[in-house]
């Protein structure tokens, strides 16, 4: 299960190691469709999520206008985003392109982002 982030935990969660953040809403069917894919990817990179209905200011900070939007953060900075439903292979390829090879190695052992 993905960790839910809020106003108090978001900045700490993205501050250091790479983490994927899923911007979603409970009423969003495409968001529900990618949830199993993101759960599987937690073995590769930590994944957390932000409910945009409850925390719209976080989504606004990163210009999230459509959901699902999955953003990769590292060192507190957004490194890229995928908008919409994509297959697992698309996310894996994207991670390999966005993160340096050494940065992806060992992330699986870290588990969920700390806050």
Region locations from a protein language model:
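N-terminal "domain-start" segment that seeds a small globular fold
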Residues: 1-12, 46
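Short active-site neighborhood of thiol/selenol oxidoreductases, capturing the structured segment around
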Residues: 14-26
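Hydrophobic beta-strand anchors of alpha/beta hydrolase catalytic cores
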Residues: 20-21, 47, 70
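Conserved acidic residues
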Residues: 51-53
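Typically the conserved alpha-helix immediately C-terminal to a functionally engaged Cys/Sec
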Residues: 30-43
């Amino acid at each position: 299960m993905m960790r839910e982030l809020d106003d108090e935990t978001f900045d700490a969660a993205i501050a250091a190691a790479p983490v994927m953040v899923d911007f979603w809403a409970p009423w969003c069917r495409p968001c529900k469709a990618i949830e199993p894919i993101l759960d599987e990817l937690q073995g590769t990179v930590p994944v957390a999520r932000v409910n945009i209905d409850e925390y719209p200011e976080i989504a606004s900070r990163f210009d999230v206008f459509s959901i699902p939007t999955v953003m990769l953060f590292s060192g507190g900075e957004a490194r890229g985003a995928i908008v919409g439903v994509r297959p697992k292979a698309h996310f894996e390829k994207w991670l390999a392109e966005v993160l340096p090879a050494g940065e992806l190695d060992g992330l699986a052992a870290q588990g969920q982002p700390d806050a």
